[in-house]
Amino acid sequence: MATVRICVCGDEGTGKSSLITSLVKGVFVTNKIQPVLPQITIPPTIGTPENVTTTTVVDTSALPQERSNLAREIRKSNVILLVYSDHYSYERVALFWLPYFRSLGVNVPVVLCANKSDLAADHTEAQVIEEEMLPVMAEFKEIDSCIRTSAREHRNVNEAFFLCQKAVTHPIAPLFDSKESALKPAAVAALQRIFYLSDKDRDGYLSDKEIEDFQMRCFDKPLSKEDLVHIKETIQKTHPDSVTPFGIDCRGFIHLNKMYAEKGRHETVWIILRAFQYTDNLSLQESFLHPRFEVPPFASAELSPEGYRFFVNLFLLSDKDNDGGLNDAELASLFAPTPGLPASWADGSFPSSTVRNEAGHVTLQGWLAQWSMTTFQSPKTTLEYLAYLGFESSDRSNPSTTAALKVTRPRKKRKRPGRVGRNVVLGHVLGAPGSGKSALLDAFLARGFSHTYRPTIQPRTAVNTVELPGGKQCYLILDELGELEPAILENQAKLLDQCDVIVYTYDSSDPDSFAYIPQLRSKYPHLEELPSVFIALKADLDRTTQRAEHQPHEYTAMLNMPSPPLHVSATWSSIQEVFVHIAEAAMEPSTAFPRSEEDVEGKWMAWGIALGAVVCAGAAAVMIWRRVSGSG
């Protein structure tokens, strides 16, 4: 909502105070009025732009002794009503007033007002505009609009102040470059995005149905067939190729809005921009890009069913060649209404972080996995891109982009039996250099095995779906920490909050590989508070004895782990079972912790109870048999 502060300037005797009085009283005041009126505040009335709360009108004096007060009021205003009434005061507009405003360093719109039109009956409206106003407007681009008024006849008085309000609420300067006679780049970019979002079938044209939907969204009233025909005819006069049987193309849409701006109908352009959440500086509203969304400790953010539907539909619309994958051109087109790929995607080497087909194009599975990971790691990023990409909530009680997300239940006591209430889980893959961590991530994404060793410096992430026993699916994120491993493992609070499982890996053919794991757990004892999975990689090679205090199976037995290390090779097809095991450990964390003495005692007690029940049942059967035999 805007508060408009109008500073009324001009030479003495041009009728500034009379204009203000006529506005307030509704009629011309014949009595002598004071030279400078006190400041007045006008509440919103019928005809006031809808986003104006209050309007303050400030009268000023042009006398030299009042120059400091004049400068102060000009600097406080957000629009200037510059009044002239005769040839002399008109000449002073270009010679003194407009250069004076510039000298003060103010950057506010100016409404040029030719007052006392009742005294210039020999000049028509068109003559005044063409001979007086247009030359000045051409020289001084800060002039937003012009109007001819008469305070005595109460002619165009309200309209003059309405133009001032509109100059603040619907400024022309951010939209149109009068010197170049073209829309400014930021305005073109905003309108291109609006066209893209309104083109629901992504065929490059706004069909009649899409134009009607656009009309209702922006103006909340239907478009008549006559108006639609007129719009098309208007575009065809300049760009005949922009109107086709399929509809209006983007060039025609931009040209139509340029014409609105050129002809003083920039209010129409602003209505369109604001319907799509644009601010006065042509950026998207902060509350729209970053709505309030909080994730409690030990909880996580995931896409809701509506969020998944949106990204599925976006994928299907963008896969123009219907090959089941998004190539570079299709991805570029999809992200056209955004600043580009999310920074986290670029840092994570997208698209190599997710599932691709044989041609290297991102599959639907990979697309959804990538957004699931993004939402888990940075829900604010997902919300921002949902806004850029045009997500519209179907939930009237929550029209925000937050309808596409949900928050999982906090998981605090991981050792308590049961599944966690989430569908996206994160595992850190740890191990000595050369243990096979990168090959494990490649196998997770069904990539071919590479015999070339490349040490991981930058963190690397892979995300994919895993089907659990029973048919339920979850998204598993595996990351190799690279040089950031010490920093991530030292941050105990963040590690315990975000990580769901630790995957310890070692090269079963390298005698020095396993020793890294006990050293790591000793250095970061809080790792014991996370579910753990131990994996012996490179099982296709000859297994060797590890140069460690304890052999891997002895170490896991000493920890009372539920199972010894899993032996597997990235070259084996059975490696997919390892990812199911990791996902199960994350989804049911109690199964991946060392068994406590209570667990063992509980098992013996259960065996004892079961054995006792069997013995009692047997004794009872013998007693019954004897009674039956005795009675016989």
Swiss-Prot record:
Residues 396-418 are annotated as: Disordered. One of its GO terms (cellular component) is mitochondrial outer membrane. Ca(2+) 2 binds at residues 319, 321, 323, 330. This is Mitochondrial Rho GTPase 1. Keywords: Calcium, GTP-binding, Hydrolase, Membrane, Metal-binding, Mitochondrion, Mitochondrion outer membrane, Nucleotide-binding, Repeat, Transmembrane, Transmembrane helix. The chain crosses the membrane at residues 604-624. It comes from Aspergillus fumigatus (strain ATCC MYA-4609 / CBS 101355 / FGSC A1100 / Af293). Residues 408-418 have a biased composition (Basic residues). One of its GO terms (molecular function) is GTP binding. GO terms for biological process: heme transport; mitochondrion inheritance; mitochondrion organization; mitochondrion-endoplasmic reticulum membrane tethering; phospholipid homeostasis; regulation of mitochondrion organization. Residues 1-603 are cytoplasmic. PANTHER family: EF-HAND CALCIUM-BINDING DOMAIN-CONTAINING PROTEIN 7. GTP 1 binds at residues 10-17, 59-63, 115-118. Residues 625-632 are mitochondrial intermembrane. It is an enzyme of class 3 (hydrolase). SUPFAM superfamilies: EF-hand, P-loop containing nucleoside triphosphate hydrolases. Residues 186-221, 306-341 form the EF-hand domain. Ca(2+) 1 binds at residues 199, 201, 203, 205, 210.
